[in-house]
Amino acid sequence: MKLRELLATVDSVENLPPVLADTEVKGIKTNSHACGAGDLFIGMPGTRVDGGEFWPSAIASGAIAAIVSPQAVEKNPPSDEAVVISSNNMTKACAAIAAAFYGYPGQKLKLVGVTGTNGKTTTTHLIEFFLTKAQLSTALMGTLYTRWPGFEQTATHTTPFAVELQQQLAQAVNAGCEFGVMEVSSHALAQGRVLGCPFEVGVFSNLTQDHLDYHSDMEDYFAAKALLFSPDYLKGRAIINADDTYGQRLIKALSPEKVWSYSVNDSSADLWMSDLSYEPNGVTGTIHTPEGDVSFRSPLVGQYNLENLLASVGAVLHLGLDLQLIANAIPEFPGVPGRMERVQINPDQDISVIVDYAHTPDSLENLLKAARPFIPGRMICVFGCGGDRDRTKRPKMGKIAAELADLAFVTSDNPRTEDPEKILDDILAGIPDTVQPTVIGDRAIAIRTAILQAQPGDGVLLAGKGHEDYQILGTEKIHFDDREHARAALTEREKL
């Protein structure tokens, strides 16, 4: 594609040299070290450094041109202005150029975007599962991986950056996908990564405290999430949780004809449930929808998973799936790695061990409440908080674990560059003096100790890492999987 054709999609680009206008662009790169001959380098401003400052490296590697911010030009003035183009809005420039270069793949798919603090991964997996059951080829992008039939790649971000995202959407189109289901993070929305993606369905699950290391406060966090439901993104229907305070605000802000609300118990919502019966292996009941009512049996436990189920049902109903087909598929849903995932080494195991990604106050509370009915003995919670992230949630999570678990093990969870002991102290500040938690900084030892101390009927909940198979210590990522350590401890326990 010619450079002038790409830049014609952007209204904030200046200084395009005529000599370069008809040059063929072979690829788009945002990493200067990855540039090769014929590439266009887009230097994106970051929170710590402006990537545009590295345009000389990109040009030296063969890039035909660099698009950077005026600030990057000012800090690193080009000696040859013919190769450096400035943009006053790098976010829009990057998204628009990437979409154009890859042939606007988002317009060739029916896209579903799911945003919210908790529930994105389970909801997107449910939507993908239902669409697949209807024999509709679907691409899934989210926290765990990007995948479609015949392809799977581990994810590095919940929502890819614009260039990678458009490339993956184009690959999905080429693979024959008709639908794309995407977790859309607040970071992605604030940074404009999904500009150029017209969503047929937008789902809002909930908003609770998280990412306040990035967003200035909860209102800023909400404003980022709400962008998904603006005309820039949403072209079809919004599916919104009416049981969430922020969801109620969104419902009021949008045109009623564009919204389906959902609620587990409120019959005034567009989608709701009745006749709920909670069992050790799941829930049964009736789902009420704008397309009719249907009985269901779900293997997922917990109130929050009922919300996830309603959201996914609403999304695929809007996309045209048959309600009875959906209900028939629900019992077959295999679950999601690291979400209420049971670790069992034999059928006669006398304790429950559950691994879950719960890493916010709300998700930890939901996990503990969901697990309680199925644990006849003591509930033992092993958890920590990530370093270089929102510090204000740490004492809140400590308080929740102290109140809802019978035994709390406070340990490390990706301390990154922070002092692990300081993180533990922040958590302990929220635990009342009347509760005596076990503090073990080494997560492997904490998991082993909790499982070896467990008595028949007890349940050990390993919270925070879920599907992750790594631990970040300083700037180093080492292999660490809660499930592996749990299996090792269970095997050791059997020999005692």
Curated annotation (Swiss-Prot):
Motif (Meso-diaminopimelate recognition motif): 413-416
Pathway per the UniProt entry: Cell wall biogenesis; peptidoglycan biosynthesis
Sequence intervals crossing the membrane: none
Chain residues that bind UDP-N-acetyl-alpha-D-muramoyl-L-alanyl-D-glutamate: 32, 158-159, 185, 191, 193
Main localization, broad class: cytoplasm
Domain of life the protein comes from: Bacteria
Reaction(s) catalysed by this chain's protein: UDP-N-acetyl-alpha-D-muramoyl-L-alanyl-D-glutamate + meso-2,6-diaminopimelate + ATP = UDP-N-acetyl-alpha-D-muramoyl-L-alanyl-gamma-D-glutamyl-meso-2,6-diaminopimelate + ADP + phosphate + H(+)
Protein family per UniProt: Belongs to the MurCDEF family. MurE subfamily.
Name of the protein in its database record: UDP-N-acetylmuramoyl-L-alanyl-D-glutamate--2,6-diaminopimelate ligase
The gene coding this protein: murE
